[in-house]
A protein has these predicted regions:
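Short, flexible, glycine/charge-rich loop motifs used to bind or transfer phosphoryl groups or to couple energy/partner
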Residues: 12, 46-48, 170-174
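Alpha/beta-hydrolase-fold enzymes
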Residues: 14, 18-19, 32-147, 157, ...
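A glycine-rich phosphate-binding loop feature that marks nucleotide/adenosyl-phosphate handling sites
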Residues: 25-31, 62, 168-171
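Conserved aromatic-histidine-acidic binding/catalytic patches
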Residues: 20-24, 138, 169
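Conserved serine/cysteine hydrolase catalytic core
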Residues: 152-178
């Protein structure tokens, strides 16, 4: 929290001279944005970081309630999470290629099987597909952040519970966001 979203707010202020920002959060970035807004809403008046630092927030494909995570839920259980946390502990992060593989499996008809059939079996040239470029532009996920995200949000669905998650020692509540 302090080294990610809040440090970004400081960097924006330093670069632009503006104290407040408009934020867009996409996918996990949206979940982190919502968490940050709840953290800011919990800060007392006069704190270094307060809710007035963010003027507006726009969310794209963002989950805050993980009770029905869709296809991704197939990949999140205690056993898988333990293996993933063990793997991430070795390097301190999850390689971006792992995230790409999960996205490929979620869109297997578009991202795997259509290429097997059309390119390998039928010998056709692959068509341009913008999702392939997006999926190959991956990001490493910091181990501590990603482990907390998967465990506390996906597995335990704590983000929707007031005080279910504490960031930098502060319990957060999404309902407090204005």
């Amino acid at each position: 929290m302090l080294e990610g979203p809040l440090a970004a707010l400081d960097a924006i202020r330093d670069a632009t001279g503006e104290d407040s920002v408009n934020i867009i959060g996409y996918c996990i970035g949206g979940t982190l944005t919502a968490s940050t807004l709840a953290y800011l809403a919990a800060q007392p008046e006069g704190a270094k970081y307060t809710a007035d630092r963010v003027v507006s927030a726009t969310f794209f494909t963002t989950m805050t309630d993980f009770s029905e995570p869709g296809e991704l839920g197939v990949f999140i259980d205690e056993e898988q999470l333990n293996l993933l946390e063990e793997h991430m502990a070795e390097k301190g992060y999850l390689e971006g290629s792992y995230m790409s593989q999960v996205f490929n499996m979620m869109r297997d008809n578009d991202l795997i099987w259509s290429f097997v059939v059309n390119n390998y079996l039928l010998g056709r040239e692959p068509m341009a597909f913008d999702l392939l470029y997006w999926n190959s532009d991956n990001t490493r996920m910091p181990a501590m952040m990603h482990g907390m995200y998967l465990r506390k949000m996906y597995l335990e669905n704590r983000l929707v519970k007031p005080g279910g998650i504490a960031l930098a020692g502060t319990p957060i509540d999404l309902k407090k966001i204005k």
